[in-house]
């Protein structure tokens, strides 16, 4: 073999010079793609095939193999169709026509293929290359396909043009991670069941992208003939209605969708990373358009708040109690394909033909796609008309269709519109980034182009100002709402009548100081209750409290020493199960001595907190509630951590790891869900207090200035300055007005707004009159306004899905 190669190489050198020009001339006459590549410059890299599979020849054998094959091909003056199919490249990523034919399989008869043409569409996306492949058959028929492949070239070029700076080496790697996830998400979408009635391109083949191993590609229907609306124009109301008819199918399918959809398409946090890192681009855009600086200064801080984007994009609907719906995620001009007004026209009609580009599909806010579309694709006038007329109409249509389909829509019109307003904020802030990329922020040389840009900028900042105005209005209204509720609680709402419980026992855990002791004083001094059963861990404090109650108020007191942190729950007195208990106050609680997340706390501290703060309330309620139900009377008061309703970021580690450890609204879920299920108990009220919007650094309690100026009496009762780190939050019995008057705090705070935030926790209205209530259950918040830490942890949310308390106890005790 080696001698044959040497001989053939000698032969090839003899005819190479004289035959080269003739070969090129004859190749051009054949108009063959592969022959046009035969030049001295690119010859060493050419692909030559002798079978149906491609082979990359080694350089040592190249001269002979290349020229010998070329001589055989050109001397016969014919090219095999098979040869052309294998070698025709599709795009820049190593795919060929042979790959396409193999992927389509039985959809094509490869023996009847006469010619294959490939061209790049001029409307490539930012993160993909789009190729149109035309296959001609011997019977004069043609088939057209679109091949979509992921790449970073376009987005990189757009950013370089925008910033007028060359991207640094390795910048591609920053895009590839997120791009891989998004592209593979679209592949998975096309692999799922087709959503009835939703117009999307047909997908013939899709393969996932594994960078460095497998080229990602999607082969789909060619929508040639359809058009898109240019991004510098606006959709009209008829077009918005046509889009709504398709969203109707998507949202109707989302009601009761399978868990597989939720698992495959969770909300992509990469989207949060993208929108929260766009400040520099927007600043550059504003700097080149000075008329925007005043408006931008009002929202600049919002761009730097990643938590804000997380709330309004991912969590805004959850806090409203709305289920997840499927979202397209990128519903804007170039992903909406329209039927043209007439054949061959480039003007879009009012009939939507197809929705493309599903790489950002996810579960989330039902209004997300409407926010995106109305913000990015409509001028101010059209958007406001759509908000006032289209959105309510769409909700009614969805509700009617759900009834027809036999599905239950757990959504009110008020929830729907509130979900829209919340999500709209993020898209209004995102719009300048997209506009700057589309316009490349460089001032236009043409006056007409600059006029169009100014119109777009006007629409952009109108949307942004609407978002900011909405935010300010909500804050003001919340402040007024809090003040009105506070006045109602302290001056209008009557005290609860406790006379029917005077002959029953009041059981209090943690009643020797702080909140628990404040309850005892209120009950015995002003409510006439004389029977108390105290449970605490300090025998001296228990005896002192007992002595004080007996000598000063003539109370009957029983005590039991129990440390919820160390003692087993089974050691609690059994007589509690048969004792005639009228009021149960679960007040025992501890707090960590350091600020940190679950992973940052010392070993064993989390278990102690769970045991004291959670299991004490669970076990005490389990023991006492059945007898209350039997006697058809009773009150349960649970003191909960403020962080049960608001989670705090406590460290840099949390931000780096993108972790959020929400504490559990411990007694709230237990009493509103589990007790009702187990004991068929109805509740008079439940309290979900709002938390202060205060971002405090890691400080000791005594270093916080508001604490030094609080009235002494309030400080004594609340225990804010001291070991207990608690505050009186007595909603059921109401402390005297001189201690908790909402107006008494204002002079001790630097602003009325801060005062309102404090009042929103200390003095919320909880009384809701209802019918046929047997057991009254109150959930009260223990303040953590000045020290933010986690009393409870994320795993409690899963624990409370268990329906029986015995199962809960066994699980937790084995866990500890």
From Swiss-Prot:
Belongs to the short-chain dehydrogenases/reductases (SDR) family. Its EC number is 1.-.-.-. NADP(+) binds at residues 503-534. GO terms for molecular function: oxidoreductase activity. Pfam families: adh_short (PF00106), DUF1679 (PF07914). InterPro entries: CHK_kinase-like, Dhs-27, Kinase-like_dom_sf, NAD(P)-bd_dom_sf, Oxido-Kinase-like_Enzymes, SDR_fam. It is an enzyme of class 1 (oxidoreductase). Disulfide bonds: none annotated. The active site is at 661 (proton acceptor). This is Uncharacterized oxidoreductase dhs-27. The keyword Ligase does not apply. Keywords: Membrane, NADP, Oxidoreductase, Transmembrane, Transmembrane helix. The gene is dhs-27.
């Amino acid at each position: 073999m080696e001698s044959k190669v040497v001989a053939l190489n000698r032969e090839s050198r003899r005819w190479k010079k004289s035959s080269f020009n003739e070969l090129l001339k004859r190749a051009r006459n054949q108009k063959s793609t592969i022959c046009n590549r035969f030049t001295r410059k690119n010859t060493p890299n050419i692909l030559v095939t002798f079978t149906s599979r491609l082979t990359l020849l080694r350089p040592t054998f190249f001269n002979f193999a290349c020229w010998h094959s070329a001589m055989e091909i050109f001397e016969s003056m014919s090219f095999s169709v098979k040869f052309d199919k294998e070698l025709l490249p599709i795009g820049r990523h190593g795919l060929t026509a042979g790959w396409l034919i193999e992927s389509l399989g039985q959809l094509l008869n490869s023996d009847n293929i006469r010619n294959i043409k490939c061209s790049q569409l001029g409307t490539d996306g930012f993160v993909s290359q789009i190729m149109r492949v035309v296959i001609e058959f011997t019977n004069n028929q043609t088939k057209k396909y679109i091949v979509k492949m992921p790449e970073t070239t376009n987005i990189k070029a757009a950013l370089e043009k925008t910033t007028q700076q060359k991207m640094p080496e390795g910048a591609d790697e920053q895009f590839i991670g997120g791009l891989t996830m998004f592209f593979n998400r679209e592949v998975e979408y096309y692999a799922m069941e087709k959503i009835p009635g939703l117009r999307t391109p047909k997908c013939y083949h899709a393969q996932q992208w594994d960078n460095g191993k497998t080229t990602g590609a999607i082969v789909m229907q060619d929508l040639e003939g359809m058009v898109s609306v240019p991004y510098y124009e606006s959709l009209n109301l008829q077009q918005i209605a046509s889009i709504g008819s398709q969203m109707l199918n998507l949202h109707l399918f989302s009601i009761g969708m399978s868990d597989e959809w939720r698992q495959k398409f969770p909300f992509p946090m990469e989207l949060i990373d993208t929108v929260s890192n766009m400040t520099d681009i927007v600043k550059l855009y504003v700097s080149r358009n000075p008329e925007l600086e005043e408006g931008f200064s009002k929202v600049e801080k919002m761009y730097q708040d990643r938590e804000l984007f997380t709330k309004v994009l991912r969590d805004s609907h959850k806090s409203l109690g709305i289920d997840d719906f499927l979202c397209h995620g990128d519903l804007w001009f170039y992903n909406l394909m329209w039927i043209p007004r007439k054949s061959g026209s480039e003007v879009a009609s009012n009939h939507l033909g197809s929705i493309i580009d599903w790489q950002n599909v996810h579960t989330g806010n039902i209004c997300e796609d409407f926010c995106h579309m109305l913000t990015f694709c409509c001028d101010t006038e059209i958007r406001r008309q759509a908000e006032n007329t289209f959105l309510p109409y769409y909700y009614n249509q969805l509700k009617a269709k759900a009834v027809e389909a036999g599905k239950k829509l757990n959504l009110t019109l008020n929830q729907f519109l509130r979900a829209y307003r919340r999500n709209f904020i993020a898209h209004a802030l995102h719009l300048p980034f997209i506009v700057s990329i589309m316009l490349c922020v460089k001032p236009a040389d043409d006056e007409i182009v600059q006029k169009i840009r100014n119109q777009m900028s006007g629409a952009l900042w109108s949307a942004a100002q609407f978002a900011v105005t909405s935010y300010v209005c909500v804050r003001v209204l919340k402040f007024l709402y809090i003040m009105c509720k506070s006045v109602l609680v302290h001056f209008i709402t009557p005290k609860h009548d406790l006379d029917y419980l005077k002959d029953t026992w009041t059981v209090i855990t943690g009643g020797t100081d702080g909140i628990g002791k404040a309850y005892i004083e209120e009950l015995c001094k002003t409510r006439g209750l004389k029977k108390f059963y105290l449970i605490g861990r300090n025998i001296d404090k228990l005896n002192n409290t007992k002595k004080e109650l007996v000598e000063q108020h003539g109370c009957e007191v029983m005590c039991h020493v129990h440390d919820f942190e160390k003692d087993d729950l089974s050691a609690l007195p059994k007589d509690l199960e048969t004792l005639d208990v009228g009021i149960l106050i679960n007040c025992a609680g501890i707090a960590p001595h350091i600020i940190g997340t679950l992973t940052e706390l010392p070993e064993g501290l989390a278990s102690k907190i769970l045991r004291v703060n959670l299991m004490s309330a669970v076990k005490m309620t389990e023991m006492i509630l059945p007898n209350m139900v039997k006697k058809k009377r009773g009150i349960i008061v649970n003191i909960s951590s403020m962080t049960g309703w608001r989670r705090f970021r406590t460290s840099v580690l949390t931000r780096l790891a993108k972790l959020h450890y929400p504490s559990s609204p411990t007694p709230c879920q237990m009493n509103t869900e589990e007790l009702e299920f187990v004991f068929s108990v109805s509740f008079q009220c439940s309290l979900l207090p709002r938390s202060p919007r205060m971002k405090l650094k890691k400080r000791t309690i005594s270093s916080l200035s508001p604490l030094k100026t609080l009235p002494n009496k309030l400080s004594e009762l609340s225990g804010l300055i001291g070991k207990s780190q608690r505050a009186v939050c007595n909603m059921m019995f109401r402390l005297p007005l001189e201690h908790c008057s909402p107006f008494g705090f204002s002079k001790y705070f630097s602003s009325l707004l801060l005062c309102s935030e404090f009042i929103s926790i200390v003095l919320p209205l909880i009384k809701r009159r209802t019918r046929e209530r047997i057991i009254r259950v109150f959930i009260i918040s223990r303040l953590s306004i000045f020290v933010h830490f986690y009393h409870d942890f994320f795993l409690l949310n899963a624990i409370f899905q268990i329906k029986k308390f015995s199962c809960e106890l066994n699980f937790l005790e084995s866990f500890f």
